Amino acid sequence: MKRMIALDGAQGEGGGQILRSALSLSMITGQPFTITGIRAGRAKPGLLRQHLTAVKAATEICGATVEGAELGSQRLVFRPGTVRGGDYRFAIGSAGSCTLVLQTVLPALWFADGPSRVEVSGGTDNPSAPPADFIRRVLEPLLAKIGIHQQTTLLRHGFYPAGGGVVATEVSPVASFNTLQLGERGNIVQMRGEVLLAGVPRHVAEREIATLAGSFSLHEQNIHNLPRDQGPGNTVSLEVESENITERFFVVGEKRVSAEVVAAQLVQEVKRYLASPAAVGEYLADQLVLPMALVGAGEFTVAHPSCHLLTNIAVVERFLQVRFCLIETDGVTRVSIK
């Protein structure tokens, strides 16, 4: 019988990533875990609908036995079974992030007994989670280099707070892994600005694009008008394609915040990325830790290791026999596996 791993949900950044990573790793390794103080670092601690959906999804996919799977719970015991491929559908029932639920269960399905399709309904454009286009255009091409083949499709947008979006991912079991080396970003090839609108006047998008174009030389400027019933909502994105990597940054518009202010937030984030020679942005760094650990080798550079990144590494090291090495050099942090 495998040992029970005890986790403190208040460690590090104290958010939902500790739980999501633990669920992924438990399904992959077969190691049970207990976690207390779930989301202790948040204003509203305990399991929200998004986190509960992730727990239920993990439970269904591997036939786990669970204690504490209810809204508001700050303690969970998870004993995994065998991961099985298949066609799965999960509904969050709020504008909680579809991609964060997918992020929880897809790594386990890389090791399933056959191909799978997972569809999640909920929020797709959430200020605190990566949108589907980030997964599709940034993360999945890097996963393919590692040997992980999955394809995400955004079927319907769902903006916060209404939700109603749908995202689906098809995934195949991994045949073999390759090592990912992302030490250098390389020269910038092109930059693309994009605005999504649903039930919001077009002049908002035009002002946001103008703000981006005032700071960067954009090779493409795209405005996409979505059906009104998918809103109201507005997302501004800027994609930076470099020789070795494509990064994508986004900001979700808010009521009573001007188009210029929304776009200026994105400009500042992209400028921070470009000010460092690091290959990987802060949010992508979080996404690369688990697949790199499963490979057991590889490296990437990031400008600064976030608390989120350090917390994720700490959880991964509890489940897998790997140790990460972080070395600051020439204004970047090089993250590798010893």
UniProtKB/Swiss-Prot annotation:
Source domain of life: Bacteria
Matching Gene3D superfamilies: RNA 3'-terminal phosphate cyclase domain, RNA 3'-terminal phosphate cyclase, insert domain
Any single Gene Ontology cellular-component annotation: cytoplasm
Top enzyme class: ligase
EC number: 6.5.1.4
Residues the record marks as active site: H308 (tele-amp-histidine intermediate)
Listed Pfam families: RTC, RTC_insert
GO biological process, one term: RNA processing
Amino acids binding ATP: Q103, Y283, L284, A285, D286, Q287
Record's subcellular location: Cytoplasm
Catalytic reactions of this protein: a 3'-end 3'-phospho-ribonucleotide-RNA + ATP = a 3'-end 2',3'-cyclophospho-ribonucleotide-RNA + AMP + diphosphate
Single annotated GO MF: RNA-3'-phosphate cyclase activity
Keyword terms of this UniProt record: ATP-binding, Cytoplasm, Ligase, Nucleotide-binding
InterPro entries xrefs: RNA3'-term_phos_cycl_insert, RNA3'_phos_cyclase_dom, RNA3'_phos_cyclase_dom_sf, RNA3'_term_phos_cyc, RNA3'_term_phos_cyc_type_1, RNA3'_term_phos_cycl-like_CS, RNA3'P_cycl/enolpyr_Trfase_a/b, RPTC_insert
Protein's job: Catalyzes the conversion of 3'-phosphate to a 2',3'-cyclic phosphodiester at the end of RNA. The mechanism of action of the enzyme occurs in 3 steps: (A) adenylation of the enzyme by ATP; (B) transfer of adenylate to an RNA-N3'P to produce RNA-N3'PP5'A; (C) and attack of the adjacent 2'-hydroxyl on the 3'-phosphorus in the diester linkage to produce the cyclic end product. The biological role of this enzyme is unknown but it is likely to function in some aspects of cellular RNA processing.
NCBIfam families in the record: PRK04204.1-2, PRK04204.1-3, RNA_3prim_cycl
Entry similarity comment: Belongs to the RNA 3'-terminal cyclase family. Type 1 subfamily.
Name of the protein: RNA 3'-terminal phosphate cyclase
Source organism of this protein record: Escherichia fergusonii (strain ATCC 35469 / DSM 13698 / CCUG 18766 / IAM 14443 / JCM 21226 / LMG 7866 / NBRC 102419 / NCTC 12128 / CDC 0568-73)
Taxonomic placement: Bacteria, Pseudomonadati, Pseudomonadota, Gammaproteobacteria, Enterobacterales
Underlying gene: rtcA
